[in-house]
Design a protein with these regions (language model features):
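Thiamine diphosphate
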Residues: 1-91
Length: 91
């Protein structure tokens, strides 16, 4: 969403129904990779949240409530897909 881009990150989709078991995160061209992986995980019976991260810097400026609404704190399993730079993903 346009608002999500302005906030640095947004939920692209929740797949599989119910509480997500894993959060897949990516930016740029890698977003298509997490979409494919998410669909495959749903086929295997998993619930997945897909998050697009256009800007770590903008996301870090958001209030904690927004950050928690995107990166659910109760979901500890998280995978970041990035072909170039690891900056930001360690957070």
């Amino acid at each position: 969403s346009a608002e999500g881009v302005q906030r640095g990150a947004y939920v692209l989709a929740d797949l599989g129904g119910g509480q997500p078991e894993v959060i897949l995160m990516a930016s740029g061209s890698e977003v298509s990779l997490i979409v494919g992986a998410g669909k495959r995980l749903v086929e295997l019976g998993r619930s997945v949240r897909l998050v697009s991260f256009p800007s770590w810097e903008l996301f870090a400026e958001q209030d904690q409530a927004y950050q928690d609404s995107v990166l659910l704190p109760e979901v500890r399993a998280r995978v970041a897909v990035e072909a170039g730079v690891s900056q930001g993903w360690r957070q």
